């Protein structure tokens, strides 16, 4: 299998020989032939033109080598290439199945899968199902350069390179804990990531600190400042598969914490790679006339002479620790950290990347248990003590460890007058004019300085100003002495904070109990008011019904015909009616009166006939069921009768 450099050269020669300008199509044809250039050309060029044999194969025929004593070989025709026809009797080697390597990332796991390109996407998912214990229907396999693909898609049809990075999403499966995930993400946003970035061309490492809220794009822009490689020409290795978007925060990109290694280089064109290979080779290759045009267009790939020579010269001179008049303090500290690492090695304090105000927030404006001291390192390149202080004291493992555990370390370079004036302004604003004057009057040979700051309720107190003419033991003793003062103050702050939280908890509990009591009283009062309103409504309905019944009773009573005398010329019927209470109602009616008059009489006494019924004994019958328009004589209620009133069911 050809190396990456050989593949670039094979790709360029294949396009030159076949005239195929589409790079994707050319790569596909080469991969189908396992990057066998001769086999790929034979598959495109008709067989009558002869079978080609390449100098890349293991069975190459001896070609002319460069010999200073020998006369130069005649130049070939413009259409000639680095290949020469041989007899058709060359036996083509049987093509081996092409294997594809996949690295699949799922949460905190990486699974390596190796399959033939004749397999399908679904077979990858089946392997992942056994490894990750995730059902295939619940699994989304992402990271394909062509977009989403079906499970039945054959890998060969995707024209994939040999090494591929994919990742698995499971939107239908609940995460381990959404709240814990959100908490972990918030914690990652507040963390600082150390990126160890290797510049491939110059074999130089940069140690850069970034906050979790920084984006991938910001990292690439900062690397451009250090390496002079524009972002569009940067070729990266080491980013996690999930870091697919330059706008993604580092906390979400899947970087290893606290350190992550990356490699960056300059993206080169296939033509440049081939020309470099030809310069190193002792075999004379005949190239086509079009290569000259390709060389003239090499600037399209970002190769500028000034950049190349500037890169070489930058490694020879000493770069400043911090740019002058930097607009952003975070960017200035990124360069400071990178330059500090390049001068004194990777073992150094973790410098906080951000403004001085942000360092205050990180150190002081948190819970009392989480507070730390703030150490401000003031650098000066022109001091004779700087190199010794940085290399032997500040980078000592004991000092680095102690600072990392107990301090937030912030740095600034006072070499340039503009940066010095800027820091004195910050110092005057945050620490007062006394400290600013102390730093202003320091001589160059007294630098570097190490300021130990402790946050208090109303102001920030400078506990100690350590000059560069010290030793590791003395520096450690002064750091520990500052830590003792801070620890005593921290314990008081923790006690005050706990007492304040206890008081606030009691107050919250009392407020909650009072609120619940008010709600209970209000609910009780509202229930009583509803009950009284309901009783009033029912009483009103009852009164209205009684008034209505009384009005009906009076109207019926007034409408009754007068009671006839016992001695009357017309026949008289005497009725005796027993009420449910046992009382008797007696009245005389004319035998010719209708039965309705009897009903009206009973209703006028408070027994409406729609609620009560009249029963006779012999024969037993319900009189209210009879025709009310018939006379008493017709219904046999003559000359006298006893009736009973019963309430209807």
UniProtKB/Swiss-Prot annotation:
Annotated spans, Disordered: 55-84
Tissue specificity: Central nervous system.
Assembly and oligomerization: Interacts with CDT1 and ATPase VCP/p97. Interacts (via UBA domain) with FAS (via death domain). Interacts (via UBA domain) with NLRP12 (via DAPIN/PYRIN domain).
Organism: Rattus norvegicus (Rat)
Principal place of residence: nucleus
PANTHER family: FAS-ASSOCIATED FACTOR 1, FAS-ASSOCIATED PROTEIN
Protein name: FAS-associated factor 1
Gene Ontology CC terms, in alphabetical order: cytoplasm; cytosol; endoplasmic reticulum; nuclear envelope; nucleus; ooplasm; perinuclear region of cytoplasm; VCP-NPL4-UFD1 AAA ATPase complex
GO molecular function: heat shock protein binding; NF-kappaB binding; protein domain specific binding; protein kinase binding; ubiquitin binding; ubiquitin protein ligase binding
Residues carrying Phosphoserine: 319, 581
Modified residues (Phosphothreonine): 579
GO annotation, biological process: apoptotic process; ERAD pathway; Fas signaling pathway; negative regulation of canonical NF-kappaB signal transduction; positive regulation of DNA replication; positive regulation of extrinsic apoptotic signaling pathway via death domain receptors; positive regulation of protein catabolic process; positive regulation of protein-containing complex assembly
Lineage per the UniProt record: Eukaryota, Metazoa, Chordata, Craniata, Vertebrata
Superkingdom, taxonomy of origin: Eukaryota
């Amino acid at each position: 299998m050809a190396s990456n450099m050989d593949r670039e050269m094979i790709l360029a020669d294949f396009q030159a020989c076949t005239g195929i300008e589409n790079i994707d199509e050319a790569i596909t044809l080469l991969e189908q032939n396992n990057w066998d250039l001769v086999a790929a050309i034979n598959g495109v060029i008709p067989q009558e033109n002869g079978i080609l044999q390449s100098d890349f194969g293991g069975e190459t025929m001896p070609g002319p080598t460069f010999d200073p004593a020998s006369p130069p070989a005649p130049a070939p025709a413009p259409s000639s290439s680095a290949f020469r026809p041989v007899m058709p009797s060359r036996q083509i080697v049987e093509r081996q199945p092409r294997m594809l390597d996949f690295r699949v990332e799922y949460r905190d796991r990486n699974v390596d899968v190796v399959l033939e390109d004749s397999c399908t996407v679904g077979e990858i998912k089946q392997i992942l199902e056994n490894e990750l214990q995730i059902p295939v229907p619940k699994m989304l396999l992402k990271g394909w350069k062509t977009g989403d693909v079906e499970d039945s898609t054959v890998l060969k049809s995707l024209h994939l390179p040999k090494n591929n990075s994919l990742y698995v999403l499971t939107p239908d499966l609940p995460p381990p804990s959404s709240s814990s995930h959100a908490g972990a993400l918030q914690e990652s946003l507040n963390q600082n990531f150390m990126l160890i970035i290797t510049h491939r061309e110059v074999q130089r490492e940069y140690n850069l600190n970034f906050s979790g809220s920084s984006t991938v794009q910001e990292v690439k822009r900062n690397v451009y400042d250090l390496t002079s490689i524009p972002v569009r020409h940067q070729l990266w290795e080491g980013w996690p598969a999930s870091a697919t978007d330059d706008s993604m925060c580092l906390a979400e990109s899947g970087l290893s914490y606290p350190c992550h290694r990356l490699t960056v280089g300059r993206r080169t064109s296939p033509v440049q790679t081939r020309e470099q290979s030809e310069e190193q080779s002792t075999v004379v290759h005949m190239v086509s006339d079009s290569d000259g045009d390709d060389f003239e267009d090499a600037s399209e790939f970002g190769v500028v002479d000034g950049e190349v020579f500037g890169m070489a010269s930058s490694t020879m001179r000493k770069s400043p620790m911090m740019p002058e008049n930097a607009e952003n303090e975070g960017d200035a500290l990124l360069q400071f950290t990178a330059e500090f690492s390049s001068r004194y090695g990777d073992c150094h304090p973790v410098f906080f990347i951000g403004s001085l105000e942000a360092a205050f927030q990180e150190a002081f404006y948190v819970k009392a248990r989480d507070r730390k001291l703030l150490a401000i390192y003031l650098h000066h390149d022109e001091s004779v003590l700087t190199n010794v202080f940085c290399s032997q004291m500040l980078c000592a493992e004991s000092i680095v460890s102690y600072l990392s555990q107990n301090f937030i370390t912030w740095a600034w370079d006072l070499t340039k007058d503009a940066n010095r004036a800027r820091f004195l302004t910050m110092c005057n604003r945050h620490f007062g004019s006394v400290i600013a004057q102390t730093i202003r009057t320091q001589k160059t040979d007294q630098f570097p300085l190490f300021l130990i700051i402790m946050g208090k309720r109303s102001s920030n107190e400078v506990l100690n100003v350590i000059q560069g003419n010290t030793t590791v033991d003395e520096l450690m003793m002064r750091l520990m002495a500052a830590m003792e003062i801070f620890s005593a103050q921290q314990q008081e702050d923790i006690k005050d904070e706990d007492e304040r939280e206890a008081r606030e908890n009691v107050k919250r509990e009392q407020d909650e109990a009072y609120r619940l009591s008010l709600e209970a009283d209000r609910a009780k009062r509202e229930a009583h008011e509803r009950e009284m309103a309901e009783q009033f409504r029912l009483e009103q309905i009852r009164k209205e019904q009684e008034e209505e019944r009384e009005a009906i009773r009076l109207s019926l009573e007034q409408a009754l015909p007068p009671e006839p005398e016992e001695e009357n010329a017309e026949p008289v019927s005497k009725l005796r009616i027993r009420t449910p209470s046992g009382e008797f109602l007696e009245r005389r009616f004319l035998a010719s009166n209708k039965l309705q008059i009897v009903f009206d009489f009973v209703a006028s006494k408070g027994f409406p006939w729609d609620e009560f019924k009249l029963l006779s004994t012999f024969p037993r019958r319900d009189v209210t069921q009879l025709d009310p328009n018939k006379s008493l004589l017709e219904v046999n209620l003559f000359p006298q009768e006893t009736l009973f009133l019963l309430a209807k069911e």
